[in-house]
Swiss-Prot record:
Chain positions covered by the region annotation Disordered: 203-224, 243-353, 412-439
Keywords linked to the UniProt accession: Transposable element, Virion
Compositionally skewed regions (Low complexity) per UniProt: 313-333
Subcellular locations according to the entry: Virion
Name by which UniProt lists this protein: Retrovirus-related Gag polyprotein from copia-like transposable element 17.6
Keyword Cell membrane in annotation: no
Gene name of the record: gag
Protein's organism: Drosophila melanogaster
Transmembrane parts of this sequence: none
Composition-biased stretches (Polar residues): 245-255, 266-312
Length: 439
């Protein structure tokens, strides 16, 4: 004879109040997969504790459960046509459980990395284990749950081997069935909070098969040869390769017009004016003197040519006056290397230039072009070589002697003026004849 199902009595009003209170204290589910198992397990526990056979009370309890779920989740799962907790639970698990396959979660649990901190390592491993077990509990597949629990238990040994050597040797002989037992054992031995500063985790890139590997894109992947950046120019390009030009400062007295002009080496010592028009050069500087090489006075060699036309004022004293002003003559007959004649007044009586003046102007002319050809000695301050305190000179005594000398000179001049000449001796002067005139 079959047994009739037991009739579940309805709940009292006080029990209904307690059910509403406990469901209201459950954390509201907002769609987080990590909190789904906690929410579902709490609701299952409350419904198992306050079971009722009254349909009216069941609808009231179901209304409290719906209010503990966010409206967005309810719209997503379409819970408007659901009237029991089993239907709602099935849709929540189907839509919000971890979608990662179980075997992938198990592999992530086994490969939990150890980064030196024992506690952080075990907490991360426990979090990954709970993710897998929570999914197995939500799916309610007994066979699959039993299978994966055995694999989790066998994976504890791989986690223990990742611990430092001194910790592994102390816990190797203990029976550790699960991860919670390992945590409790390390807490008892005082090794749960240890931090290993020498990490056993070895980075793979330090032991790469290609130590010469470069992360630059300009690398030949076949033979691992570095290719340096080169200009994009084909071998059969009609455009020839042009070397960069060397620039120098043009010789001009105006500091506002010191733009670079191209300089080409001149090995034959021939005057070659620049053929390139400089758009930045003003028109009045087209005929300016360019001291690249000398055309006249070729008998004097050039020893150290200053190609930058720079004059070191600190080394050679004062800078000489430049004599390369533009001539007022016709540009066709203008010779830039000719010395400029110094003008003289008309009544000077000198119509030409002396040889010394000509050579002096030549020296001044070449000095502006090649300042290192001729060396001259600047005026030194002799106080550096003869200090003032080396000879103690009495200035007062020296002045007194000088004054006495001047007074003596004045006294001698006065005596000479007062002395009268001997007129008598001058009037009676007779020349004396020689005794022997034949001599």
């Amino acid at each position: 004879m079959a047994q009739e199902p037991a009739i579940v009595p309805p709940l009292s009003d006080s029990n209904m109040t307690q059910v509403a209170y406990q469901i209201g204290n459950v954390e509201k589910f907002n769609g987080d997969p990590g909190s789904l198992y906690t929410f579902v397990s709490r609701i299952d526990y409350i419904l198992a504790l306050y079971a009722t056979g009254d349909e009216r009370q069941q609808q009231i309890i179901f209304g409290h459960i719906e209010r503990s779920i966010s409206g967005e989740v309810m719209r997503c799962i379409g819970a408007y046509d659901m009237y029991t907790w089993q239907q709602l639970r099935r849709q929540l698990v189907l839509n919000y459980k971890p979608q990662t396959p179980n075997h992938v979660l198990l592999e992530e649990f086994r490969k939990t990395p150890f980064r030196g901190n024992v506690r952080a390592f075990l907490e991360e491993a426990e979090s990954r284990r709970q993710t897998l077990t929570s999914k197995l509990e939500l799916e309610q597949d007994l066979e699959e749950k039993t299978f994966y629990l055995k694999l989790i238990k066998s994976s504890i040994e791989s986690l223990i081997e990742k611990l430092p050597t001194h910790i592994y040797l102390r816990i190797n002989n203990h029976n550790i069935p699960d991860l919670r037992s390992l945590i409790n054992l390390l807490q008892e031995k005082g090794m749960y909070e240890q931090i290993n500063h020498t990490s056993t985790h070895v980075q793979k890139q330090n032991f790469s098969d290609k130590p010469q590997k470069s992360f630059n894109q300009n690398t030949n992947q076949s033979n691992n040869i570095r290719k340096y950046p080169t200009p994009f120019l084909h071998y059969n390009s009609p455009i020839p390769y042009q070397a960069p030009q060397i620039y120098q400062t043009p010789p001009t007295n105006n500091p506002l017009y010191r733009h670079p002009i191209p300089y080409h080496p001149n090995p034959n010592n021939v005057f070659q004016p620049s053929q390139q028009n400089n758009v930045f050069q003003p028109s009045q500087q087209n005929n300016a003197f360019q001291p690249n090489q000398r055309t006249n006075f070729t008998s004097r060699p050039i020893f150290n040519t200053n190609r930058n036309n720079a004059f070191d004022q600190n080394r050679f004293g004062q800078q000489p006056q430049y004599q390369n002003q533009q001539s007022t003559q016709n540009s066709s007959s203008y010779v830039p290397n000719r010395p400029i004649k110094r003008l003289r007044p008309a009544n000077s009586g000198q119509t030409g230039m002396s040889v010394d003046e000509t050579l002096y102007q030549e020296d001044a002319f070449y000095q502006q072009c090649v300042p290192y050809d001729y060396f001259y000695y600047p005026t030194y301050d002799h106080s550096d070589y003869y200090p003032e305190n080396q000879y103690q000179i009495d200035e007062n005594n020296q002045n007194l002697q000088r004054t006495q000398q001047l007074q003596q000179i004045n006294t001698d001049e006065t005596n000479n003026d007062n002395q009268e000449p001997n007129v008598e001796q001058a009037e009676n002067f007779q020349p004396q004849a020689l005794e022997n005139p034949n001599i």
